A protein has these predicted regions:
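Mixed-charge, low-complexity intrinsically disordered regions
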Residues: 1-77, 83-146
Length: 146
C-alpha cells in the first residue's frame, strides 16, 4: 500500500491530526524484520550514530514511523516510545531481546549488527568499535496491513 494512503487510513480511524511521521525500511532483510514487527516479536531497532548526517535529527518519543517492505510498499505504522544513545559495547540483553532477531540473545545481536554496521562503514574505510554510539529506538506497533 502507498505510505500516504496507509497514513490517512490510520489517521481517520484514530482521529489523529497532523502528519508527524517518517517513512523507512529496515536496511538488512527488510521483509523478515517487518514480519517480526507485525507479529509483535520486534519492538526495538538500532542504527549507527556516526552514519547520521550532521543536520539529521534522531527520532523522538511520540513520533510515528511508516515501515516499508522491500518493494517500497507500506505495511505498518509504529509509534516511537523511547530513543537513547549507548556504546556498542554497552548494548543490553534487554535491548537485544526487544530487537526480536535470531535467538534474541545479546551475542546474536552483536554478531549480526557488527557485520551489518561494518558493511555500512566499508565506503568510509572504517570498522565499528566498541566505543561507537548506537541509536536505540523502542516502538509499539499501532497499525498494520493484513
Amino acid at each position: 500500500m502507498d505510505a500516504e494512503k496507509l497514513w490517512n487510513e490510520f489517521k481517520n480511524k484514530n482521529s489523529i491530526d497532523g502528519d508527524n511521521y517518517s517513512i523507512w525500511a529496515f536496511g538488512d532483510n527488510p521483509n523478515l524484520l517487518l514480519k517480526l514487527v507485525k507479529t509483535g516479536e520486534k519492538t526495538a531497532t538500532s542504527s549507527l550514530y556516526k552514519l547520521y548526517n550532521s543536520d539529521e535529527e534522531l527520532s523522538k518519543a511520540g513520533e510515528y514511523n511508516i515501515i516499508l517492505n522491500s518493494k517500497g510498499q507500506a505495511e505498518c505504522i509504529t509509534k516511537t516510545t523511547k530513543v537513547y544513545l549507548t556504546k556498542f559495547s554497552d548494548i543490553t540483553d534487554a535491548h537485544a531481546y526487544k530487537e526480536g532477531e535470531g535467538d534474541k540473545s545479546l551475542s546474536y545481536w552483536k554478531n549480526i549488527h557488527e557485520r551489518f554496521f561494518n558493511e555500512c562503514l566499508t565506503s568510509y574505510n572504517e570498522k565499528i568499535t566498541s566505543d561507537d554510539l548506537i541509536v536505540c529506538e523502542e516502538f509499539e506497533l499501532v497499525y498494520k496491513v493484513n
